Structures are given as structure tokens and as C-alpha cells.
């Protein structure tokens, strides 16, 4: 592909430069192959301009970025006003195939579940479907584990192109605030956007909640085209801001939840009742009532399911078929997932690693703890330090027994992280070794108790210093149960 085809007029007026043949794209100099266009991006930790020489030595045919380097280069340099946006659009042109129907979901919590639920609904309706997000890529034909909620534009567009070649016609993906703020999602032809909720998160990246919300709103202001669907959970303080952004873009508004527009295009939750490890729901859509049994635990999973249903309906699926499909949903891995029991007490694993998510998980499980609700959790290092005491206070208020442990301490002192949590959680126990904490919590379970192990969910690593050690909450639970059975 020609340089001009990838960068447009930014490639300049020199016909020889514009006609340079590009065989690939790269943002990491270590991944450059001969013939690649290297994007020298500046970031929070380093400046890509430092690696231009290495990229050229590896065979880069041209370099694109912000202000040009002060020294002459042996290959063309293209100066870009917005290098990150240009990268995303170039990736979309280099990997041009996309499913006909694409839904993106943003919000603090629930993105993974909504993307998974939307994929499952479409699959139930006989569409070849996929989802991309925190747990990676999942489709009818492939599952690829990932570590980023929103991959970099090259990886994202490559994945989208590949699954389209596989025959995928419907895609649901997570739109993180980082991904939106850094233009990683631009160039994706989004049919509908969904919004779950907003609470404190990523305060190590966003200076305040207003900046965080504005990053989320890019989905509705810039990515979903006019006439596309905007599915918004209407039960939150910031919902009005999201609705306003959607209406300003002339999107088809669908509100869901207890304040959803059930008389119109939205979905109103009329009633919900616990039914074992499921919930009986009464819903209203376009004035018609529907009664379904949702096989999921927790009010927040109802919200997630309704956003997913809205995305499916908003992209053309039959409402009756969509609501019937809700009765077959399976929770995403590590999202309030029932993984075992001891002495009749259920054991759950949940990804909750922020204050609001921890509160919702504990509140969801309270009805299942006739005796005591137990939680094991920690907080990540090199991340928002302000949430640690908040999570400690929430655990102390919502649970009966609290064990504070480690959760990806990274470069920080694990004991200091635990101390910040414990300061707000009087009576909590400290067991730094996560496997030991899980073992102790399970060993102490009595009939009528319920245990949730929070923070990691689907993850299979414990980051200590600069090293990622293999660790899985699922495996730790299995090992603890096996040890007690032997």
C-alpha cells in the first residue's frame, strides 16, 4: 500500500514520498520489519522519537510522528498534527475488512459482560459473532487471550480484519477511556454505542472525573455516526450527560434500566426478584411487557444484560428473540462467577478492583449469605492510590469478614498497599500471600456463608516488580478445595 493511501494529504506533495510502498505498520521499534511504516508516538513513559534510529535500522521504509527530529534521516519523515489519530486511520485502511454490525460499549464497570452478552445474544440469533476486550478476542472460531481492554490500533484493526475473513458479521467490543482518549478506536465503523455507568477509576491517568467522563463521551460524540443507536443506562447521575452527547450527535436514543423509556424504544426494568442463582425480571419495551428469567446474580448484571439487549435491538435484532436469548446468558469469566463451594457455602470470583464495583459485588452476594459474607481482596500498585482506603471502608461496611491480600503490587511495597486498605477496614485480617489468603478464607467457611475473591477475575498473573508470575484465583480455589478433600 502506498504511503499516500495510508496517510492521505499528510504524506505531502512530493510524489516520490507519497508513492513509497508500505508493507506493514509498527509502533514498537522491536516489532519493525523491512518495509514497515514506523509511528513514533510520544507517551506517558517514553517518546517514540528515541527509537527512530532503531526502527530504521530494522528496515522501516518511512517514519511518521509529531515534530520531526533535529537530525536528518535516511528515510522520509511525515509530520502529523495528530499522530495517534493518524495511526488509527492508517490501521483501518491497511486492515480494511470489518463486520457489517459493530457495537461498542463504554463505562467504568460492566464493559466485559456487556460485550460478552451482546455476542451471546447474536449467536443465539444465528449471527456469526465475536467480542473483543479485557478477556481478549472471543468468536465462533477463535479465542485469543488479551491483557488490554482496548488493544492498540494496529492489533485491533488486524483482529477485526481477521475475524471478518473468518465470516464474523457481528462484533461487540469494549471502549475504554484510555482507548477513546488515545484514539485507538478511530476508524472502526461503529453501528451502536452503549454506556453502563461511571464511578471512580483510572485517577492515575485522568486528572478528574470530568476528564474521565469526557473521554467516555468520545464514543457518542465522534465514533457512532449520526443515526446510529446510543444505548444508555438511565439510572446514574451522569446518564443525562451521556444522553445529551448522543442527542447532539443525532443518535437514536435507547435508555434502559428502572428509568428506561419502556413506553418507547428503550427498555424499562419494571420488577426484579431473586430466584436462586438467577433473577425473574419484568421488562417493558415499546409499551409491551416481557417476563424473563435471567440466569445471573446481582442487580448490576441486570443493568449489563439490558444494555446488551439494547445494543442487539438497536442494531436490528427482533426484540422478542433478544429477550428470549437473555434467558440463556452465561456470565463472563471472573465476573461474579460461581466457582465452587465448601461446607455448603458458595465461592465466587469477581474482577471488582475499584470501589463501586466492589460495593456492587458485595451487595449482590448479601442475599446468599444467611450467616457471614466473606471477601478477599487487595489493590494494584502503581495505580490510583486514593481508591485503597475507599475499598477498605466498603469492604468493612458490606462484608462480615475481610481478608486483605496482594493484587499486582508492581513496583510498590505490598505491605504499604495493604496498610492503606487496612487503615479504613478495622477488624480486617492481613494475609499478603494471595494463595494463602484464599486457602484460609475457604477453610473457615461455614454453612450459610458466602465468599467472594475480588480483584483479579479472569487474570492469570501476579505482577511483582517488573515480573509477571503465573497466578490464577481459579487455580488457587481449586487447589484449596482439593487440599481439603484429600
Regions found by a protein language model. Name each.
Residues 52-57, 164, 186, 366:
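Non-catalytic positions within long, well-ordered alpha-helices that form the structural scaffold/packing
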Residues 1-15, 34-37, 43, 47-50, ...:
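ATP-dependent carboxylate-amine ligase
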Residues 73-81, 144-147, 250-253, 428:
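Active-site regions of enzymes building and remodeling cell-envelope glycoconjugates
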Residues 1-93, 229, 237, 268-272, ...:
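N-terminal leader/targeting and accessory segments in enzymes
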Residues 6, 36, 55, 90, ...:
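Residue-level signal for inorganic ion chemistry
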Residues 86-234, 240-251, 369:
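Phosphate-binding loop of NTP-binding sites
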Residues 61, 191, 400:
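Receiver (REC) domain switch/active-site residues of two-component response regulators
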Residues 3, 68-73, 166, 181, ...:
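Acidic, Mg2+-coordinating active-site environments of NTP-dependent enzymes
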Amino acid at each position: 500500500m502506498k504511503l499516500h493511501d495510508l496517510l492521505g494529504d499528510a504524506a505531502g506533495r512530493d510524489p516520490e514520498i507519497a508513492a513509497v510502498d508500505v508493507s506493514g505498520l509498527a509502533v514498537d521499534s522491536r516489532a519493525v520489519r523491512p518495509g514497515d511504516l514506523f509511528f513514533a508516538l510520544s507517551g506517558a513513559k517514553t517518546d517514540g522519537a528515541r527509537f527512530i534510529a532503531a526502527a530504521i535500522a530494522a528496515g522501516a521504509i518511512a517514519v511518521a510522528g509529531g515534530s520531526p527530529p533535529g537530525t536528518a534521516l535516511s528515510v522520509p519523515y511525515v509530520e502529523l498534527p495528530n499522530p495517534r489519530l493518524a495511526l488509527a486511520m492508517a490501521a483501518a485502511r491497511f486492515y480494511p475488512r470489518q463486520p457489517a454490525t459493530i457495537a461498542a460499549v463504554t463505562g467504568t464497570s460492566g464493559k466485559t459482560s456487556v460485550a460478552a452478552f451482546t455476542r451471546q445474544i447474536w449467536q443465539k440469533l444465528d449471527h456469526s459473532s465475536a467480542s473483543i476486550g479485557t478477556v481478549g478476542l472471543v468468536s465462533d472460531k477463535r479465542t485469543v487471550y488479551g491483557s488490554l481492554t482496548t488493544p492498540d490500533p494496529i492489533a485491533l484493526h488486524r483482529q477485526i480484519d481477521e475475524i471478518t475473513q473468518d465470516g464474523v458479521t457481528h462484533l461487540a467490543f469494549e471502549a475504554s477511556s484510555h482507548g477513546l482518549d488515545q484514539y485507538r478506536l478511530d476508524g472502526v465503523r461503529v453501528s451502536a454505542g452503549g454506556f453502563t455507568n461511571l464511578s471512580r477509576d483510572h485517577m492515575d491517568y485522568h486528572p478528574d472525573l470530568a476528564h474521565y467522563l469526557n473521554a467516555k463521551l468520545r464514543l457518542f460524540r465522534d465514533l457512532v455516526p449520526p443515526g446510529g443507536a446510543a444505548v444508555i443506562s438511565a439510572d446514574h447521575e451522569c446518564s443525562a450527560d451521556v444522553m445529551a452527547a448522543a442527542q447532539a450527535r443525532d443518535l437514536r436514543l435507547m435508555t434502559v434500566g428502572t428509568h428506561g423509556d419502556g413506553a418507547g424504544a428503550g427498555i424499562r426494568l419494571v420488577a426484579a426478584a431473586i430466584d436462586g442463582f438467577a433473577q425473574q425480571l419484568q421488562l417493558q419495551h415499546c409499551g409491551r411487557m416481557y417476563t424473563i428469567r435471567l440466569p445471573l446474580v446481582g442487580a448490576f448484571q441486570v443493568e449489563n444484560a439490558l444494555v446488551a439487549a439494547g445494543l442487539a435491538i438497536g442494531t436490528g435484532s427482533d426484540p422478542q428473540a433478544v429477550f428470549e436469548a437473555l434467558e440463556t446468558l452465561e456470565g463472563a469469566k471472573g465476573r461474579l462467577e460461581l466457582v465452587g463451594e465448601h461446607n455448603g457455602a458458595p465461592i465466587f470470583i469477581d474482577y471488582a478492583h475499584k470501589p463501586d464495583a466492589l460495593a456492587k459485588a458485595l451487595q449482590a452476594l448479601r442475599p446468599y449469605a444467611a450467616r457471614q459474607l466473606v471477601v478477599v481482596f487487595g489493590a494494584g500498585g502503581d495505580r490510583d492510590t486514593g481508591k485503597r482506603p475507599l475499598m477498605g471502608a466498603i469492604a468493612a461496611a458490606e462484608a462480615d469478614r475481610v481478608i486483605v491480600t496482594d493484587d499486582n503490587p508492581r513496583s510498590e511495597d505490598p505491605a504499604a498497599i495493604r496498610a492503606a486498605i487496612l487503615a479504613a477496614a478495622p477488624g480486617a485480617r492481613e494475609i499478603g500471600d494471595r494463595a494463602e489468603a484464599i486457602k484460609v478464607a475457604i477453610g473457615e467457611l461455614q454453612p450459610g456463608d458466602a465468599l467472594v475473591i475480588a480483584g483479579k477475575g479472569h487474570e492469570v498473573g501476579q505482577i511483582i516488580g517488573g515480573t509477571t508470575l503465573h497466578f490464577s484465583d481459579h487455580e488457587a480455589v481449586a487447589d484449596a478445595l482439593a487440599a481439603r478433600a484429600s
